């Protein structure tokens, strides 16, 4: 899936040629990835994020928790992004569910999120990638126990069809509306002071830390002045 095709979809969406429906209706005038002031650490579309709500750069990471590339990214790239950019207020890092292979694991992560442990659960899934199979709710319950979650509430959430629907809608939104070709894929977005997108760059597939850093620097650089005669 070539970069140019992915970027073309993004440019059309920015130009308003693609309608931007989301899994849940948004308040007027906001974008789906903006922080929801009513839910700490969540966006308006319900995704979880790390970092300052007012960071000038937003990274959207489209993830499948059974993806070896995603696991490697979290281990080798995200760690450095967190130290150098997320923790310093430069980047807000949003995990967008794109579970082509493991939708049930995505449901489990959302259930952990209901108890304030989305990232801890997601990291357990990716760290132990070869230790669980998609659809094995017993394994998911085991990870919930490892995190000392309320196991009854977790089990009830796993059986909640609305959470399953949320995951299905997230996958459909990423595929149909954003044009995400695979997991992982990334959008790096420069936002204005209101949190709305000014510039968007799309990258299908894994992205080395050097490319993240280069794009963050370029998006932060002031625009080149237009020469005057």
Put a short name on every predicted segment.
Residues 51-53:
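Short, flexible hinge/linker loops that cap or flank conserved catalytic cores
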Residues 1, 55, 60-145, 181:
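Structural alpha/beta surface segment adjacent to cysteine/selenocysteine redox centers
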Residues 1-46, 57-62, 72-78, 82-83, ...:
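C-terminal cap of thioredoxin/glutaredoxin-like
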């Amino acid at each position: 899936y070539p970069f140019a095709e992915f970027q073309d979809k993004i440019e059309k969406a920015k130009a308003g040629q693609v309608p931007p429906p989301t899994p849940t209706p948004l308040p007027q005038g906001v974008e789906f990835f903006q922080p929801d002031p009513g839910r700490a650490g969540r966006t308006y579309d319900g995704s979880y994020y790390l970092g300052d709500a007012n960071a000038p750069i937003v990274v959207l990471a489209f993830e499948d928790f059974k993806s070896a590339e995603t696991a490697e990214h979290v281990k080798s790239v995200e760690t450095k992004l967190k130290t150098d950019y997320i923790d310093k207020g430069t980047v807000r890092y949003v995990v967008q569910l794109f579970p082509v292979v493991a939708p049930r694991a995505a449901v489990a992560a959302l259930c952990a999120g209901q108890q304030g442990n989305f990232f801890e659960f997601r990291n357990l899934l990716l760290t132990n990638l070869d230790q669980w199979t998609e659809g094995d709710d017993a394994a998911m319950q085991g990870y919930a126990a490892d995190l000392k979650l309320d196991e009854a509430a977790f089990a009830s959430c796993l059986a909640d069809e609305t959470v399953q629907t949320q995951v299905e809608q997230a996958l459909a939104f990423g595929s149909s509306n954003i044009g995400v070709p695979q997991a992982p894929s990334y959008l790096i977005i420069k936002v204005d002071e209101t949190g709305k997108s000014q510039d968007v760059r799309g990258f299908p597939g894994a992205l080395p830390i050097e490319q993240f850093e280069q794009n963050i620097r370029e998006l932060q650089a002031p625009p080149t002045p237009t020469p005057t005669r």
